[in-house]
């Protein structure tokens, strides 16, 4: 079969095949002899790789988005003197004739020089760090919600029907009742009357009936442990909120404008900026933005 040469559109490039413990890099281009080297994924080794690429005059670097292993490589290679591209593995997955790691890196390099690779959008470092904070906060919020559901299940196990007579166990009265149950294992009608609020739909008598369960030492221990975990997690969430506010302080005007949109709270705006940023020039059309935000159908056939 006749070999068809690629037209070179990039001056000097490097293709990198990334693995957990090793990266294989191939350089080629104008004035360069094609060369392949392997490096460990330790920071010192990746720094050596960066120095080799810069000394060789490499202008573009391309690598597949392999799991999470590409991230430290990207962070170390990222610099003003080189464009580092992360490419979708599907763009080169089905190309035949490359079975070893060295050939993989050489093939990526060849496709890069020919201009046949399209870089994925990678947010700036500041936005990536902000996204780490907001996503971690959301995970912790989900954890607190999960622990609330665990409390409901434990109370149901004790045949305490608070969740059936109050709208939410987050309310002031419900929290005080749970605290009393944890402290003493029971509540009295007088205690319910003292903390009762007229806004509650349930009567004091109905609350008392709902609290007439059989709470045991094991249940008390579980409830105490869960409440302690929730309090600690809420403290971390509050710390994260302060850190996020500090990071977003340069964009306070943008945030105020976005919060004028009905339904957008401050937290929602913080999450929005963390996910899509404030520079919409990164997205050619609204469809690209929707795809990046994960709110459009996918086709993975």
Where are these regions (language model features)?
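A detector of single, family-specific signature residues
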Residues: 1-301
């Amino acid at each position: 079969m006749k070999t068809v040469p690629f037209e070179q559109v990039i001056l000097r490039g490097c293709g990198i095949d990334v693995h957990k413990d090793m990266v294989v890099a191939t350089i080629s281009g104008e004035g360069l002899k094609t060369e392949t080297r392997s490096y460990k994924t330790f920071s010192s080794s990746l720094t050596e790789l960066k120095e080799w690429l810069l000394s060789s005059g490499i202008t573009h670097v391309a690598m597949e988005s392999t799991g999470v292993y590409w991230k430290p490589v990207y962070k170390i290679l990222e610099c003003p003197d080189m464009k580092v591209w992360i490419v979708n593995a599907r763009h080169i997955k089905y190309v035949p004739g490359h079975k070893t790691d060295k050939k993989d890196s050489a093939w990526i390099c060849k496709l890069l020089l020919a201009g046949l690779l399209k870089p994925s959008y990678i947010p700036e470092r500041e936005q990536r760090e902000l996204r780490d904070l907001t996503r971690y906060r959301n995970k912790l919020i989900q954890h607190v919600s999960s622990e609330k559901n665990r409390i409901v299940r434990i109370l149901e196990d004790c045949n305490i029907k608070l969740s059936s007579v109050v709208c939410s166990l987050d309310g002031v009265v419900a929290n005080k009742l749970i605290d009393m149950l944890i402290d003493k294992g029971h509540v009295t009608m007088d205690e319910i009357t003292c903390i009762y609020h007229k806004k509650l739909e349930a009567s004091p008598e109905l609350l008392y009936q709902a609290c007439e369960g059989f709470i045991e030492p094991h249940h008390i221990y579980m409830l105490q442990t869960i409440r302690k975990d929730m309090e600690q997690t809420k403290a971390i969430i509050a710390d994260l909120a302060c850190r996020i506010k500090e990071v977003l302080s340069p964009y306070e005007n943008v945030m105020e404008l976005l919060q004028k949109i009905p339904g957008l709270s401050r937290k929602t705006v913080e999450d929005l900026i963390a996910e899509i940023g404030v520079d919409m020039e990164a997205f050619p059309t609204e469809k690209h933005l929707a795809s990046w935000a994960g709110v459009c159908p996918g086709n993975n056939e």
